[in-house]
């Protein structure tokens, strides 16, 4: 049974002087991701799971200006697994008018439930988007090997790190009109590619997860590097796999 919080206890969940507290981290990371061009125009998002509590950035806001009091807090143990349009259980809802939970919520839950991830990041990286356009339209996944930055990526996003000569494979799914409608496609791709550390969304961006926020961030950075180098390799007719 999920713990019951008083209003005071719920409010205290987003106020801490600890810079490593999830509510503070989400704000800091969103600012850093904004500088990288990953969450501009209110796009993208991040969620951190700490024990049985999930911290969630709001949707449709200036990500570089998020404050801890804007963070939504949900119990991981929901009455039902979040799905498009489903009702959510909340521990804390921000008092500021106009704030809504992230549209990425059910997709973050895919990472939490299917990979037991501790954090999930969604970016609108231009490198991710361009890569999905440069690859053949019917390509089910992105594959690359013999790149040093592969060593910063983990099997399934949460397992052992890949080796230089191993092949990284990231599935690609088609975009939908509404973010939440990606939930089923993402889950299906995660089931088909259990070793994938992320999901690319054609003409949209990428979802990346990890055991911890540190691992999710590191892998998002490594993957973005690999997406960028892959775009340049394709444009210069250099094979993505092998050491030739």
UniProtKB/Swiss-Prot annotation:
Substrates-to-products reaction catalysed: 5-(methylsulfanyl)-D-ribulose 1-phosphate = 5-methylsulfanyl-2,3-dioxopentyl phosphate + H2O
Keyword entries, A-Z: Amino-acid biosynthesis, Cytoplasm, Lyase, Metal-binding, Methionine biosynthesis, Zinc
Pathway per the UniProt entry: Amino-acid biosynthesis; L-methionine biosynthesis via salvage pathway; L-methionine from S-methyl-5-thio-alpha-D-ribose 1-phosphate: step 2/6
Organism superkingdom: Eukaryota
Details of cofactor binding: Binds 1 zinc ion per subunit.
Main location: cytoplasm
UniProt-annotated binding residues for substrate: 104
Cofactor(s) needed by this chain: Zn(2+)
Signal peptide: none
Enzyme class: lyase
Cell compartment(s), UniProt: Cytoplasm
Pfam families given in the database record: Aldolase_II
BP terms from Gene Ontology: L-methionine salvage from methylthioadenosine
Assigned GO CC terms: cytoplasm
Active site: 148
UniProt GO MF annotations: methylthioribulose 1-phosphate dehydratase activity; zinc ion binding
SUPFAM superfamilies attached to this UniProt entry: AraD/HMP-PK domain-like
EC number: 4.2.1.109
Protein task: Catalyzes the dehydration of methylthioribulose-1-phosphate (MTRu-1-P) into 2,3-diketo-5-methylthiopentyl-1-phosphate (DK-MTP-1-P).
Family per record: Belongs to the aldolase class II family. MtnB subfamily.
Protein name: Methylthioribulose-1-phosphate dehydratase
Organism: Cryptococcus neoformans var. neoformans serotype D (strain JEC21 / ATCC MYA-565)
């Amino acid at each position: 049974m999920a713990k019951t919080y008083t209003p005071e206890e719920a409010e205290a969940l987003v106020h801490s002087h600890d810079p490593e507290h999830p509510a503070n981290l989400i704000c800091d990371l969103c600012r850093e991701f904004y500088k990288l061009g990953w969450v501009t125009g209110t796009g993208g998002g991040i969620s951190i799971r700490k024990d049985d509590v999930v911290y969630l950035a709001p949707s449709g806001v200036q990500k570089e200006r998020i404050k801890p009091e804007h963070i939504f807090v949900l119990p991981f143990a929901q009455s039902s697994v979040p799905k498009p349009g489903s009702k959510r259980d909340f521990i804390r809802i921000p008092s500021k008018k106009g704030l809504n939970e992230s549209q990425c919520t059910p997709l973050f839950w895919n990472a939490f439930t299917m990979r037991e991830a501790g954090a999930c990041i969604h970016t609108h990286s231009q490198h991710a988007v361009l890569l999905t356009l440069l690859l053949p339209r019917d390509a089910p996944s992105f594959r690359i090997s013999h790149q040093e930055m592969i060593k910063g990526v983990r099997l399934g996003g949460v397992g052992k790190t890949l080796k230089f000569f191993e092949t990284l494979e990231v599935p690609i799914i088609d975009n939908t009109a509404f973010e939440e409608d990606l939930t089923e496609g993402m889950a299906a791709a995660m089931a088909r590619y259990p070793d994938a550390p992320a999901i690319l969304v054609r003409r949209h961006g990428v979802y990346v997860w990890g055991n911890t926020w540190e691992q999710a961030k590191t892998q998002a950075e490594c993957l973005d590097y690999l997406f960028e180098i892959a775009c340049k390799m394709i444009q210069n007719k250099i094979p993505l796999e092998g050491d030739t």
